[in-house]
């Protein structure tokens, strides 16, 4: 009986969020919903039929929630205004709408989207970025960067696609308030925005992956990126976020189960990846030592992004000709 009451309570609280975020006039109607559910609970002994009938309200709201379709037909904020696309012609990769913004401050920038070309056969490395903000240790934003033999990089970040007048938030992210977007960008945009302008604490690691699986992973991400043009999806704080989307692609396209990074409280996902052998490191190097060496700073030393990248690369020359560890 107690479990049933807890289930009713929790589902009612969740359903209140559906009313607040997804129903016209929600900020007002949610109070009517809460009052009605409270009255039904208070009268549960005198009016048990009314109380039992109220159980169906969260179920109806769940059905309504599940039927809300995602759409690309909205006005989007400039940073998320364009969906990238990836064309594969033999070994040639053509990436359209690569974000390459020029920043003066975090909010003052020139919006610029470009087309980039890469050689699939020259795809050589995959770097994993973990960026913390506001001193939060257990929460982070995770990103990837594909590296090519000719020195080119293509950065990837899974984010909330914010509509005009929309605001970031973990709770709205539970209620279909944002689309999910895969941003493909120059590192000078995606990474430098966080290190040099937002002053976040960012760490960059090299993933332990061979070239064959790296190519499979890239093609898998390309397929997911292209699919969003015809089949947009909602971002979800728990099930479809910056980390779960990366993990799902590694699982689905590489056919391995070792990619098990913590999806929500993902600030420790680099530690988890190290423990599972997913990060390259020097022989005998502890995670603490690796993390210290992988810290990119937060722009306080005045380095621009190319200088940060060059400094970081110096620490990985040891692995230039070394085989991937099992």
Where is each model-derived feature located?
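Glycine-rich catalytic cores of cysteine/serine-nucleophile enzymes that process amide/ester linkages
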Residues: 93, 104-202
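Alpha-helical transmembrane signal-anchor/signal-peptide segments
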Residues: 70-89
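Cytosolic-side transmembrane helix boundary signature
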Residues: 31-55
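Juxtamembrane "helix-exit" motif on the non-cytosolic side of transmembrane helices
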Residues: 15-24
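Short, small-residue-biased leader/transition segments that mark boundaries at the very start
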Residues: 1-8
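A cross-kingdom marker for long, charged
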Residues: 267-326
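Active-site nucleophile-His-acid catalytic modules used for acyl/amide transfer and hydrolysis
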Residues: 185-265
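Internal/C-terminal transmembrane anchor helices
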Residues: 47-70
């Amino acid at each position: 009986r107690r479990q049933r009451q807890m289930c009713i309570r929790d589902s009612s609280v969740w359903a209140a969020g559906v009313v607040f975020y997804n129903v016209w006039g929600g900020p007002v109607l949610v109070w009517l919903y809460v009052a009605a559910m409270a009255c039904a609970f208070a009268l549960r002994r005198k009016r048990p039929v009314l109380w039992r009938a109220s159980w169906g309200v969260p179920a109806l709201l769940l059905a309504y929630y599940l039927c809300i379709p995602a759409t690309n037909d909205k006005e989007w904020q400039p940073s998320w205004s364009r969906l990238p696309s990836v064309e594969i012609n033999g070994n040639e990769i053509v990436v359209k709408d690569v974000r390459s913004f020029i920043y003066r401050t975090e909010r003052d920038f020139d919006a610029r989207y470009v087309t980039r070309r890469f050689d699939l056969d020259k795809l050589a490395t995959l770097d994993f970025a973990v960026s913390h903000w506001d001193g939060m240790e257990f929460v982070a934003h995770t990103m990837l960067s594909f590296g090519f033999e000719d020195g080119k990089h293509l950065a990837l970040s899974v984010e909330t696609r914010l509509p005009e007048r929309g605001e970031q938030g973990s709770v709205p992210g539970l209620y279909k308030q944002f689309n999910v977007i895969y941003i493909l960008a120059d590192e000078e945009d995606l990474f430098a925005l966080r290190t040099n302008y937002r002053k976040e604490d960012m760490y960059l690691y090299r993933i332990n992956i061979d070239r064959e699986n790296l190519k499979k992973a890239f093609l898998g991400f390309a397929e997911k990126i292209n699919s969003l043009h015809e089949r947009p999806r909602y971002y979800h704080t728990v099930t479809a976020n910056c980390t779960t989307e990366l993990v799902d692609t590694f699982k689905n396209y590489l056919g391995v189960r070792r990619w098990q990074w913590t999806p929500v409280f993902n600030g420790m996902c680099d530690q988890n990846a190290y423990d599972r052998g997913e990060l390259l490191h020097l022989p005998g190097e502890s995670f603490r030592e690796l993390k210290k060496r992988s810290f990119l700073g937060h722009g306080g030393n005045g380095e621009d992004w190319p200088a940060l990248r060059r400094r970081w690369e110096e620490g990985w020359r040891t692995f230039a000709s070394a085989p991937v560890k099992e």
